[in-house]
Amino acid sequence: MSPVLGCDSKSGSIPDSAARPLLGSPMTRCFWCNEDPLYIAYHDQEWGVPLRDAQKLFELLLLEGFQAGLSWITILKRRARYREVLHGFEVERLAQLSDAEIEALMLDPSIIRNRLKLKAVRTNARAWLALQDPVGLLWSFVGGEPKINHFKDRSEVPAITSEAEAMSKALKKAGFTFVGPTICYAYMQASGMVMDHTVDCDRYAILSR
C-alpha cells in the first residue's frame, strides 16, 4: 500500500510505475506524489525527514488526526489556516481550549469542521503535556533512530507495522485519540521515524545515508 500521510490512497490516477519526473523537474519521486506544487514541495522537503522538535511533532500528530478518512493534500492545503486558528499549535494554549472556542471553530469553512476531531485537539494537547518526554516516547518505537526501509515499489510499503501498533497502544493508554495504528504509521513515515521513500525516488539516496 501507499503511505497514508502524503498520499491520496483513493486516487486512481497514479500509475503503478511509481516514481516519475513531474512538472519538468529532473527529480524522480515516490509513486504517491501527484502534480500539485504543494505536494511536490512537501515530498521533496518534509516527508521522511527525521523530526525531533517537540512542537512540530505535536502539530504533525494533530494534522494526522485531521486527515483521518481524507487525503493528505486536503489537510496540506489547509495547514496554514490550521496554524492560524489553532494558535500556532501551541500545546499549552490548545490544552485550555473552551467548548465555546471549539464551537466557534465549527463555523469556520476554511478548516475541516468535524467536532470529534476538533475536540481531539484539546484532548491530545492535555495528554501531550502529561508526558514527561513525548519526543523520547515517540522515537522509542524505532529505537531512537530512523528505520531505513528499502522498498522497491508501492506493493511493499505497509499501512501498519508492529511498531505502529505499539505506538498506537501506548498513546491511547496515555489518553490520546485519533491515534490508531494506520495513523501512527503515517505519522512515523512523515516524521522520518521510518524512511519509506522507495528506492527509485531521488530522496531515498539522500535520506538513507
Q: What residues fall within each predicted segment?
A:
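Short hydrophobic transmembrane-like helices used for membrane targeting/insertion
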Residues: 1-4, 14-16
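HhH-family (HhH-GPD) DNA N-glycosylase catalytic core used in base-excision repair
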Residues: 15, 20-209
